[in-house]
Amino acid sequence: PNGKVLGVEHLRKVVEWARARDVVVASDECYLGLGWTEQPVSILDPRVCDGDFTNLLAIHSLSKTSNMASYRTGWFAGDADLIAELVSVRRHMGLMMPGPIQHATIAALNDDSHEAEQKQRYCDRREILHDALVAAGFRIDDSEGGLYLWATRGEDCWQTVDWLAERGILVAPGSFYGPKGAQHVRVCL
């Protein structure tokens, strides 16, 4: 929830740990194109997995980088055997993507310029919001990537939620994301 970007060495350790236990790693990489201070790295990057995709799944979507939230269009990459199992299950669930969404997906995948434009839009919002929060006495932690700022004033998150709500600003309390978020709020760009 905080936008922290895991580096190559950290991800290598995750892969090594999982392989030692024959565990699947499913990496949500929907924000991969939205790094700000750090460039996110895929679990499938050769520096992370040495080119071996066994038990690794990278999950991608167009919802963030292409502004196609709720279209439910995305894909898996990685271990071919795991993907074959997922395709088999999906085939029997009767799920079908409507034709217009298929066409929108194809258009998005064939055009990289809109992603750069969308990223710039988010970057501009992030800069304005970051500066406004800091001016209001907040500290921004992590927030190296993604569409959120992880902000704190050093108080209980619910006090911050109330303070911001009084000013017409809606945020998510950090406690929604676990005890480590008790003094943070998640602010959407």
What are these regions (language model features)?
Residues P1-L189:
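PLP-dependent class I/II
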